């Protein structure tokens, strides 16, 4: 496969940045509203669970954002690039630290991406490279937030509905919207990865639809099975999560991940990967991806079947009579369809064998990544000057589009 051929920052990138920021604000507002509803109704336990999920998600996302800011500051070309593009916060470490401590780093990244994108797309100013660089980081942060907050919250929403045996139409709409949003965020992340590929391999509507469907059909039954089992054995589900999350984090460690530039950052990444794997597959290492994916899906399918069988055996036959049999049939069926759509995607739509562009031949082979300038990656786009390469996302691309 050819090397990367980046497009210039376009109005589509700007629209996605605006939608991402609006989604973040709406999601934050809905979380606050839901927490207030729990508190008003006297559901103190669920109130604190929801607040805890919000706090944990915010802490994880802000920590990733701060780590990346620190890593980027060590790159030789960072200050020159940010000053030339008049980037918000730029190289101001103290201000950036204060913003992240106040849990506003992710929001500032959204504002910076919109501001930079508007200057580049509408005013035709310089800085297209850094605008694209920012969108790549945001796509990864949104994915992390999705599985640290949105997926657990969706599980909680379904659990509350099952536990109370009360369901309103607005709850079904909210659950459907949340599930769709989670699958869409995975597609958005995939779209960001695809931007590194040659133009002929850009993600089309057909590819996006298949990718969306297999994620939707695998994530939805997983979340439903977790909520169903929690509705009858809530205490055991906490132990279930801790055991699987720990095992998944150790599996990520055994695979030798190298996404972050520090030991602490890498362990945070592995812990986050463990949380993502609790809900959905996420490739973290190139080579032999097919075998690792098969192991994961075999385990998750078995675990899901056990969860569903446990719920069936311990449920209240009277309270669940109207929907129990339908769920028992539908959830495994959706899961199986999701696996079929995933196989279809990898057979017909998935590019392979991409590798990040090589460093400048004049650089020493043993030079640490942190000492490689942003301009040391000679990526060309026609007659344009070399462009910035987001090493973090480029590494993810190499792993995701490796030969399976």
UniProtKB/Swiss-Prot annotation:
Keywords assigned:
Apoptosis, Cell membrane, Membrane, Transmembrane, Transmembrane helix
Q: Any stretches that span the bilayer, and where are they? A: 14-34, 44-64, 169-189, 209-229, 232-252, 262-282, 293-313, 324-344
Work out whether the entry's keyword set contains Cell membrane.
yes
Could you name the domain of life of the organism this protein comes from? Answer: Eukaryota
Pfam families according to UniProt? XK-related
Q: Which GO terms describe its cellular component?
A: plasma membrane
Q: According to its record, how does it sit in the membrane?
A: Multi-pass membrane protein
- InterPro entries hit by this protein: XK-rel, XK-related_scramblase
Quote the catalytic activity from the record: a 1,2-diacyl-sn-glycero-3-phospho-L-serine(in) = a 1,2-diacyl-sn-glycero-3-phospho-L-serine(out)
Biological process GO terms, please?
apoptotic process involved in development; engulfment of apoptotic cell; phosphatidylserine exposure on apoptotic cell surface
Localization per Swiss-Prot or TrEMBL: Cell membrane
Q: What is its main location?
A: membrane
Please indicate if the UniProt record lists Kinase as a keyword.
Answer: no
* Protein family membership: Belongs to the XK family.
- Known role: Phospholipid scramblase that promotes phosphatidylserine exposure on apoptotic cell surface, possibly by mediating phospholipid scrambling. Phosphatidylserine is a specific marker only present at the surface of apoptotic cells and acts as a specific signal for engulfment.
User: What name appears for this protein in its UniProt entry?
Assistant: XK-related protein 8
Recorded source organism is Gasterosteus aculeatus (Three-spined stickleback)
Classification from the root reads: Eukaryota, Metazoa, Chordata, Craniata, Vertebrata
